[in-house]
């Protein structure tokens, strides 16, 4: 037993010396001064191109404005020819809605001949109705379980005012010839068609983001929203 115990002790000591020799060898390893500790971090060409496509830091202001205007124009096309496309939702912006809102408010101001403040309250009224109404509809959509984001909904509702803005332009042109029965009938047809198109276009984009059993609860406020704007356009009378 003593001999076997001594053998195990000798074996353990040999293993210890071997490990010590192994680590001692590692301590002799050093970095040669002839080898430069430096290098280049290269990025694949495809990644560089992808980053450059979305970078606007070095882009002229003119190109940026033109690109944004083209994007707004493409969204106008989506509204006039609504279809099941996520482009309006994916690439949302508020420049188009702001432009349409200001244009519509400017054309509606001064509509009352009895206005003593040159139409300023009417401009504010149109501006507040459009944006406040859009916010209320968006909150209603979110509370009903809609999956669309807040700003995406504002974008859709704002861009879908385009048919009503076109109707306002047509009504202003028709009113240049007078405000008789024929003029009212023409304006009624134009506003009704534009109201229907705005409602149809907005629901085409928003319907898929709502639960199936709650779509009617979302469409009804949209109907009222565009109806109020259409009524303001139909009852517009230029000041003299």
Swiss-Prot record:
Superkingdom as given in the UniProt entry: Eukaryota
UniProt cross-references to InterPro entries, sorted A to Z: Yip1/4-like (IPR045231), Yip1_dom (IPR006977)
Lumenal side stretches: 113-125, 171-172, 237-240
Cytoplasmic side: 1-91, 147-149, 194-215
Membrane topology annotation: Multi-pass membrane protein
Compartment(s) where it occurs, according to its Swiss-Prot or TrEMBL record: Golgi apparatus membrane
Pfam entry (one): Yip1
One Gene Ontology CC term in the entry: Golgi membrane
Annotated TM spans: 92-112, 126-146, 150-170, 173-193, 216-236
Record keywords: Golgi apparatus, Membrane, Transmembrane, Transmembrane helix
GO biological process, one term: endoplasmic reticulum to Golgi vesicle-mediated transport
Family statement: Belongs to the YIP1 family.
Protein name: Protein YIPF6
Organism listed in the record: Danio rerio
């Amino acid at each position: 037993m003593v001999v076997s115990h001594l053998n195990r002790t000798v074996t353990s000591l040999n293993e210890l010396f071997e490990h010590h020799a192994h680590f001692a060898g590692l301590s002799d390893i050093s970095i040669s001064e002839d080898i430069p500790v430096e290098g280049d971090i290269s990025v694949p060409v495809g990644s560089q191109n992808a980053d450059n496509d979305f970078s606007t830091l070095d882009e002229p202001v003119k190109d940026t404005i033109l690109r944004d205007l083209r994007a707004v124009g493409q969204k106008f096309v989506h509204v006039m020819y609504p279809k099941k496309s996520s482009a309006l939702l994916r690439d949302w912006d508020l420049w188009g809605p702001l432009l349409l809102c200001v244009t519509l408010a400017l054309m509606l101001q001064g509509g009352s001949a009895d206005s003593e403040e040159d139409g300023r309250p009417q401009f504010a009224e149109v501006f507040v109705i459009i944006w406040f109404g859009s916010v209320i509809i968006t909150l209603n959509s979110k509370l009903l379980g809609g999956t669309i984001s807040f700003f995406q909904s504002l974008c859709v509702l704002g861009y879908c005012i385009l048919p009503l803005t076109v109707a306002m332009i047509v009504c202003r042109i028709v009113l240049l010839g007078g405000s008789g029965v024929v003029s009212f009938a023409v304006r009624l047809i134009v506003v009704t068609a534009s109201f229907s198109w705005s409602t149809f276009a907005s629901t085409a984009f928003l319907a898929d983001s709502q639960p199936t059993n709650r779509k009617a609860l979302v469409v009804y406020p949209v109907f009222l929203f565009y109806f109020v704007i259409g009524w303001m356009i139909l009852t517009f009378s230029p000041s003299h």
